[in-house]
Structures are given as structure tokens and as C-alpha cells.
């Protein structure tokens, strides 16, 4: 059965896009902030910075101590997390609808007041390196995924994994992180999505209160290299110690906005 959503949209003067869906079936909400940046926006030398930065977003701001963001959400009956993809980075809180303002306040705060320090970078760098070892270097499925994408794409940024290459994770600098923050973590590069037990007009007022004063940034006019048209089969064989063979096959298809994609 198809789920029908009655979506309402509001645009702040600073470019922030707000999407709402009102649903009073339970006294809970899901609050999400999606930034239009992922590993696709990286370049050789700083691959993995989008995912590394996701980790650093939990390490405190001018007004919130390290890890306090998650503690405050949990103390008020909620959960929070984040994820990075090739195209987007998202942060979310699921919590009682009475605590909507808390989630809005915390997310707005770290959009503009994040504290980036050498100690934080050093700490999270090691966490991400260990994550990479676990999910890719010591994982057959991880090796297969890396081999698949690096073979299917030779020019487009999809060719590297979201977590990045280990050599780049090792050398990403604090200045790289600060430049990344200034460039992408800005209201005119973000979409706020709020679902659940809300009053749309009151919700707009709360979002305007905390996000409305944040100044937009001038977004870079990025040119993503286009992949050459593939005219024949590409193949990569990986030889590893395993009990049975693994196989992965990928096909290039048009982008999601193409008329050839059924909707």
C-alpha cells in the first residue's frame, strides 16, 4: 500500500529549506538535518572528510560540551545518530514531540558554533581509521565494494568509498576541516525535515527562532567530472582466502532526474 504524505514546505530567508509532515498518531517526532554534501564533493587528498566531519559534529560547540548533544537528547527520552553517503550527510533525533525545541536548538547550534580542535581531529581520526580497518581492510564485503566502485568509476568521485582512503584519512588537516565546515555546513546548503506530532505554524516559528539568524555562505560552483561512456565490460578479480567465491555486478544507469527513470 502506498503511503501518502501531506508535506508542507517553508523556505527561510537564509535559504534553509524546511519540510514538514503532520502526524498525530503518536506523541513523537523525527527531526532531521540533511546537508547537501557527501563523498561526491571530495577530491583526492581529502577523501573521507565528509564522514570524518560527521564524527566531529558530536564533539562539542561553543555552547554544548563534547558528547553533551547526545546526552541531552537521551535524557529527554530520545535517540540520535547520523550517517554519510556519497551524496548527502544527515543528522537526526527521534524524541517526544514536547522536546522539539531542544532538537532544533542543538542542531542550529552546531551548524554555526562547532568547536574544531586539533585534539578532536586526532581522536576522531583514529576512530575512523579503526572503522575503516573493520569494515573494509579486514572485510571481504568491504574489499568487494571498494573493488566494484573503483572499477565501475574511473573519473567520477563515486570511485572512492565514503569512508575514504586510509592515506587521506591520515593526512586530513584541521584547516581542511575548517574549510569544509565553512563551505558546506550552511543554511542554504541544508534541508530540515520534521515528521510527526507537530503544529506546522508553531514549528516554523521555532525553526525561524534558532536557524533564522544564521548567515548563508556563498556556495561553490563545483564541477563533478563526468564518467566516460562505458563501451565494454570491465572486470576486476580479487584473490583472497575465503571458503567460497563472491561476485558483484554493477550496471551504469541514468541519473535519478532522467526521463528514462520510471517514477
Where are these regions (language model features)?
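Non-catalytic, conformational "gating/processing" segments within enzyme and secreted inhibitor domains
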Residues: 125-126, 175-210
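Active-site SXXK
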Residues: 47-61
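Short pre-active-site segment immediately N-terminal to the catalytic Zn-binding motif
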Residues: 38-46
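Acidic/histidine-enriched alpha-helical segments
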Residues: 115-133, 199, 218-232
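Non-catalytic accessory/assembly modules
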Residues: 119-123, 139-147, 198, 205
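M16/insulysin-pitrilysin zinc metalloprotease superfamily fold
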Residues: 60-63, 94-125, 259
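Bacterial peptidoglycan biogenesis and beta-lactam-recognition machinery
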Residues: 58-62, 112-119, 199-201, 211-217
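Non-catalytic beta-strand/loop surface segments
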Residues: 1-39, 65-98, 135-189, 213-258
